[in-house]
């Protein structure tokens, strides 16, 4: 065994060294140099400084401008809510613990931080699944003529929360557990031990299959079909240029959001899977800490992509920031509205 299992923690270092201490009570500077903990704190502070304003601004701008309250935008707002949850209840805790060099808030604080981080990440993932399915239904039209309405959007949002809770809640009630990971400054599900009291193995398999592989496969399938349909429609010139442009813009935005999520979370999922299937193998604290902390950057990807690629939202945001005046002077009426993209008619291939 190349690690040390204790009460609600696992340290990736053998206790034969005599250095291992509880991550809830002592600084973990034997795992990494103090400057590395400070660097993680600086990184978390950076994410807090960008993540909270940009996600909060997304919520405020959508609330202030009625024209943005379109069904598709409700899902995007749900992504901003997920990002805000991660910033407020996850990043602040991790910033504080990284400064101290250990998880100073104890097992209860670890469970709360792990739950919030998992919940926010899962809401983001399942929101992207809903967006992918919406794009597939609207563009590929497997159900014929279909309009994505507010009722569909709210049902999709409810679905994302149910799926997210079904992943994040079990470790709170005894199916697996949340423990410090990497450099012991942030918490996640227990991939590290086979503790029979918590049935870790069955939970990790459930999480990987139902809450990563299945949603990612769904996203790839829907976008594979979507790309084929859009290419076929463009080749046949079945739709007007403006309609095709609107579909391409919305689809490109959602695809970039998906890619952003995968870039942020795939390294973490891959390392967690390696640890799970190679229990007892030696690995450094940084081996898990780097992808774990990098995955947190997903909270700022989606709103940045949304602002950059959605001209209507960008104009509304500038109007809000500059007290009713857009310094760029862009005409919002020139922007293709979200509602138009929802009712467009791209014939199936």
Curated annotation (Swiss-Prot):
Residues bearing PTM N6-(retinylidene)lysine: 296
UniProt keyword list: Chromophore, Disulfide bond, G-protein coupled receptor, Glycoprotein, Membrane, Phosphoprotein, Photoreceptor protein, Receptor, Retinal protein, Sensory transduction, Transducer, Transmembrane, Transmembrane helix, Vision
GO molecular function: G protein-coupled photoreceptor activity
Any single GO CC term annotated in Swiss-Prot or TrEMBL for this entry: photoreceptor outer segment
Matching Pfam families: 7tm_1 (PF00001), Rhodopsin_N (PF10413)
Segments on the Extracellular side according to the record's topology features: 1-36, 100-113, 177-202, 277-284
PROSITE patterns per record: G_PROTEIN_RECEP_F1_1, G_PROTEIN_RECEP_F1_2, OPSIN
Transmembrane segments: 37-61, 74-99, 114-133, 153-176, 203-230, 253-276, 285-309
Post-translational modification: Phosphorylated on some or all of the serine and threonine residues present in the C-terminal region.
Subcellular localization: Membrane
Disulfide bridges in this chain: 110-187
Membrane topology type: Multi-pass membrane protein
Compositionally biased tracts (Low complexity): 334-349
SUPFAM superfamilies reported for this sequence: Family A G protein-coupled receptor-like
GO terms for biological process, alphabetical: cellular response to light stimulus; G protein-coupled receptor signaling pathway; phototransduction; visual perception
Main location: membrane
Region (Disordered): 329-349
Entry-listed glycosylation sites: 2, 15, 200
Segments in the Cytoplasmic topological domain: 62-73, 134-152, 231-252, 310-349
Family: Belongs to the G-protein coupled receptor 1 family. Opsin subfamily.
Function, as annotated: Visual pigments are the light-absorbing molecules that mediate vision. They consist of an apoprotein, opsin, covalently linked to cis-retinal.
PANTHER family in the cross-refs: OPSIN (PTHR24240)
Protein name stated in the entry: Green-sensitive opsin-3
Gene: opn1mw3
């Amino acid at each position: 065994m190349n690690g040390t299992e204790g009460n609600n923690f696992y340290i990736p270092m053998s206790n034969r060294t005599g250095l291992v201490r509880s991550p809830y009570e002592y600084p973990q500077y034997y795992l990494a140099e103090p400057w590395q903990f400070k660097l993680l704190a600086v990184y978390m502070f950076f994410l807090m400084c960008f993540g909270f304003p940009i996600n909060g601004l997304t919520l405020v701008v959508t609330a202030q401008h009625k024209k943005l309250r379109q069904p598709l935008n409700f899902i995007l707002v749900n992504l901003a809510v997920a990002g805000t949850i991660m910033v407020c209840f996850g990043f602040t805790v991790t910033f504080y613990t990284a400064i101290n060099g250990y998880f100073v808030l104890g097992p209860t604080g670890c469970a709360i931080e792990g739950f919030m981080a998992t919940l926010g990440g899962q809401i983001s993932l399942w929101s992207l699944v809903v967006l992918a399915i919406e794009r597939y239904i609207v563009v590929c039209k497997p159900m014929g003529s279909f309009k994505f309405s507010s009722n569909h959007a709210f049902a999709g949002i409810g679905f994302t929360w149910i799926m997210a809770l079904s992943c994040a809640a079990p470790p709170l009630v005894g199916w697996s557990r949340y423990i410090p990971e990497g450099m012991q400054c942030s918490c996640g599900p227990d991939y590290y031990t086979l503790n029979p009291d918590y049935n870790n193995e069955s939970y990790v398999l459930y999480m990987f299959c139902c809450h990563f592989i299945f949603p990612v496969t769904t996203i790839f399938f829907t976008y594979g079909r979507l790309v084929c349909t859009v290419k076929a429609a463009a080749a046949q010139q079945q739709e007007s240029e403006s309609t095709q442009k609107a579909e391409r813009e919305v689809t490109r935005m959602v695809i970039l959001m998906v890619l952003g999520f995968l870039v942020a979370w795939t390294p973490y999922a891959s390392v967690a899977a390696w640890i799970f299937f190679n229990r007892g193998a030696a690995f450094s604290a940084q081996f898990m800490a780097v992808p774990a902390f990098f995955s947190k950057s997903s909270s700022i990807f989606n709103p940045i992509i949304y602002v950059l690629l959605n001209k209507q939202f960008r104009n509304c945001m500038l109007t809000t920031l500059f007290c009713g005046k857009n310094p760029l002077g862009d005409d919002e009426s020139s922007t293709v509205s979200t509602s138009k993209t929802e009712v467009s008619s791209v014939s199936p291939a």
